[in-house]
Regions:
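Position-specific detector for the leucine-rich repeat
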Residues: 131, 152, 170-172, 192, ...
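Bacterial N-terminal signal peptides
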Residues: 11-22
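Bacterial N-terminal signal peptides that target proteins for export
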Residues: 2-13
Length: 273
């Protein structure tokens, strides 16, 4: 199957592209350079959290930055963990830089790692190294970036924002409810999956690999979807929709939106429910 359609006027993608220029899927911190060790009693007020350690964290927003470790957390695990900051973000990481198989083995010796974290505000959250985060409080912010990698997990998201970027890779899992007044961008790849509900004025979806987006209750005004590989996306109702599918990807949506540019190639498919 190889079909292409176009419908005047100009592509709906233009509106989304202009609105999403200020959003980027780059990591909040591509390395730990610029971060220095910090004591729990002397942490600055932070607006971002980076967890690069296999630990379960409960995240509170709206109070002075602090961290409290579970009293039952094994001492050997606590000794392996280190806190760093660049003055804006709090980084939870390992004292020893590990890669590859060494990092994989380290996960098995760090079971029982738990903590509660408080940040003054939250504009960015990055999870890696099989970290798991539960957002305890609802978040109201002009913009938010959530970046997941590895086999990390995010739950409890209740967001009200002007702009929202979500990027997920590896076997990461996320879920939440969002209300986005302007631009919302959801990027998934690898075997990652996400479940979202709520509303986004301008929604852009990009899926690769075997990633999956389950969002039948996520509504949008203008929606753009780009899927490849064996990815799947289920989206709710919208006013206008444009899409480009390749590989064996699948897209399903609700309602009867105005259709803009459409491209379907390979064994990919689109269905309206």
């Amino acid at each position: 199957m190889n079909t292409k359609y176009s419908l005047p006027p100009a592509s709906l993608l233009l509106v989304l592209t202009l609105s999403l220029l200020s959003l980027s899927s780059c990591r909040l911190s591509s390395s730990h350079l610029g971060f220095t060790k910090v004591d729990t009693a002397r942490m600055p007020d932070c607006e971002a959290l980076i967890v690069d350690f296999p630990i379960d964290v409960k995240v509170h927003v709206g109070e002075r930055t602090a961290i409290v470790f579970d009293p039952e957390m094994p001492e050997q695990v606590r000794r392996e963990l280190e806190l760093r900051t660049d003055g804006r973000a709090l980084l939870i990481t390992s004292r020893r830089e590990q890669t590859g198989f060494g990092r994989f083995l380290g996960r098995w010796s760090r079971k029982g790692a738990k903590a509660e974290v408080w940040v003054t505000s939250l504009h960015g959250l990055e999870l890696g190294s099989s970290a798991r985060a539960q957002l305890v409080d609802s978040i109201t912010t002009p913009s938010l970036r959530l970046i997941l990698s590895g086999a990390s997990t995010l739950t409890g998201l209740r967001l009200s924002a002007g702009k929202f970027l979500f990027s997920s890779a590896g076997a990461s899992v996320a879920s939440g409810r969002v209300s986005v007044d302007e631009a919302c961008q959801l990027e998934l790849e690898g075997a990652s999956s996400a479940r979202f509900e709520g509303y986004a004025d301008e929604l852009k979806v990009e899926l690769k690999g075997a990633s999956s987006l389950k969002a039948p209750e996520l509504q949008g005004r203008v929606v753009s979807a780009e899927l490849s590989g064996a990815s799947t996306a289920h989206i709710g109702t919208m006013e206008a929709l444009s899409y480009a599918l390749s590989g064996a990807s699948r897209l399903s949506y609700r309602g009867r939106p105005v259709l803009g540019e459409r491209s379907v190639t390979g064994a990919s498919s689109v269905s309206a429910q």
